[in-house]
């Protein structure tokens, strides 16, 4: 039940998604062609934005997070899944890791409130925020 939006900035990845969904008979996933600043989500439409090992790659993180927040329903959640910078034993280059503090600083100007950090994964943390009714800071 519900709709899942699969967002990518590469049309070929959305074509692959569609092919896989068609083969599996999955009907509730919609591919969305986003941009480097905007995931192009319908306003106030999503309960959860899940970003797995991607946020650190954004060239325009402020704008992207602002637009993700616009797509979230009030009380909706954002989950950042990123390799733990705090753990030197995680065999990933530093530029592909984020600390919890970094993620929290990125979220601060936006209408987001920290909910929890889940450390159950062996190399990544899941840092969860919920959308508040506050207005984001504009740059």
Enumerate the language-model features and the residues they cover.
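Conserved SAM/SAH-binding beta-strand->alpha-helix loop
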Residues: 10-11
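Conserved class I S-adenosyl-L-methionine
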Residues: 14, 77-104
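Conserved SAM-binding loop
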Residues: 17-18
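Conserved SAM-binding strand-loop segment of SAM-dependent methyltransferases
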Residues: 24-37
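A short acidic, Gly/Pro-enriched loop at the edge of an enzyme's catalytic core
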Residues: 37-49
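A short SAM/SAH-binding and catalytic strip from SAM-dependent methyltransferases
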Residues: 47-62
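A short glycine-rich, Lys/Arg-flanked "PGG" loop and its adjoining helix->strand segment in the class I
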Residues: 62-77
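Core SAM-dependent methyltransferase catalytic element
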Residues: 110, 114-139
């Amino acid at each position: 039940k519900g709709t899942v939006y699969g967002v990518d900035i590469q049309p070929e990845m959305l074509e692959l998604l569609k092919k896989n969904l068609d083969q599996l008979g999955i009907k509730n996933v919609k591919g969305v062609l986003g941009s480097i600043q905007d995931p192009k989500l319908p306003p106030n439409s999503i309960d959860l934005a899940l970003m797995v090992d991607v946020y650190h790659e954004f060239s325009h993180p402020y704008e992207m997070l602002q637009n993700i927040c616009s797509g979230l329903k009030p009380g909706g959640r954002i989950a950042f899944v990123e390799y733990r910078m705090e753990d030197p034993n995680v065999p990933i280059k530093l530029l592909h890791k984020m600390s919890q503090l970094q993620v929290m600083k990125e979220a601060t100007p936006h209408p987001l409130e920290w909910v929890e950090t889940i450390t159950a994964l062996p190399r990544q943390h899941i840092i969860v925020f919920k959308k508040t009714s506050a207005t984001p800071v504009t740059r």
